[in-house]
Amino acid sequence: LTAKLSYPIYDDLDIYTRLGGMVWRADAKNNVGGGDRSNHDTGVSPVFAGGVEYAWTPSIATRLEYQWINNIGDAGTVGTRPDNGMLSVGVSYRFGQDEAAPVVAPAPAPAPQVQTKHFTLKSDVLFNFNKSTLKPEGQQALDQLYTQLSNLDPKDGAVVVLGYTDRIGSDAYNQRLSQQRAQSVVDYLVSKGIPAGKITAQGQGESNPVTGSTCDNVKQRAALIDCLAPDRRVEIEVKGV
């Protein structure tokens, strides 16, 4: 019975030693005075061994070993007490050493899908014509909008308020008016509780009209104002909800 101690030299090559003991039984038969005499003895002797071992696979290895056993037998009993030395080459097989399956990292969780919600309010509901101050009806409309925004938890996203005018008036005037109207909506929603750092106002002037060429043949001013009403609007985009 021996204990094996190994030390790796390379990934697959080890040197090792074995230390322990061997229980032995020695039998002797001598011819004494014309007759045979048998004798035997038992005992324990130390075992020393050393070698190198190369692993071809996790299960199969080849080894070269020298083993020494000291004092086998008893000179007083069996007439001799030899030592035993042995050089051996062997192959070993380890059970249960199959290569482990590669560890597959779990797939990363999909990135949360960023959605953008759109709301459109008529400027004629929010403001008087050519004005940027909210009407009471406009405040009521924004109160309802704020309730919807709260349900979307806009604190986790960004809110962009886009102001649009119709094409009546100069480009510079319409740009300024659209910015003022968008800012009025932003200020009101901030007063309701939307963080100021999460909401911005952008005036778009008379760009992106929704009426197209519908009103091109309308000449009377009052009728043209009514026809272009859909272009006068405030759009609200809630991003990242």
From Swiss-Prot:
Region (4 X 2 AA tandem repeats of A-P): 105-112
Disulfide bond entries: C215-C227
Keywords: Cell outer membrane, Disulfide bond, Ion transport, Membrane, Porin, Repeat, Transmembrane, Transmembrane beta strand, Transport
GO cellular component: cell outer membrane; pore complex
Positions of the record's site feature: Part of salt bridge gating mechanism: R63
GO molecular function: porin activity
Sequence ranges of the Sequence repeats: 105-106, 107-108, 109-110, 111-112
A Pfam cross-reference name: OmpA
SUPFAM superfamilies in the cross-refs: OMPA-like, OmpA-like
Membrane topology: Multi-pass membrane protein
Membrane spanning stretches: 1-8, 13-21, 46-55, 60-67, 86-94
Gene3D superfamilies in the cross-refs: 2.40.160.20, OmpA-like domain
Ranges where the OmpA-like domain occurs: 114-241
InterPro entries xref list: Bact_OuterMem_StrucFunc, OMP/PagP_b-brl, OMP_bac, OmpA, OmpA-like, OMPA-like_CS, OmpA-like_sf, OmpA-like_TM_dom
Major subcellular site: membrane
GO biological-process terms attached to the record: monoatomic ion transport
Subcellular location: Cell outer membrane
Quaternary structure and partners: Monomer and homodimer.
Functional description taken from the UniProt entry: With TolR probably plays a role in maintaining the position of the peptidoglycan cell wall in the periplasm. Acts as a porin with low permeability that allows slow penetration of small solutes; an internal gate slows down solute passage.
Similarity remark: Belongs to the outer membrane OOP (TC 1.B.6) superfamily. OmpA family.
Domain remark from Swiss-Prot or TrEMBL: The extracellular loops are most variable in sequence, and in some bacteria confer sensitivity to phage and/or colicins.
Protein name: Outer membrane protein A
Origin species: Shimwellia blattae (Escherichia blattae)
Gene coding for it: ompA
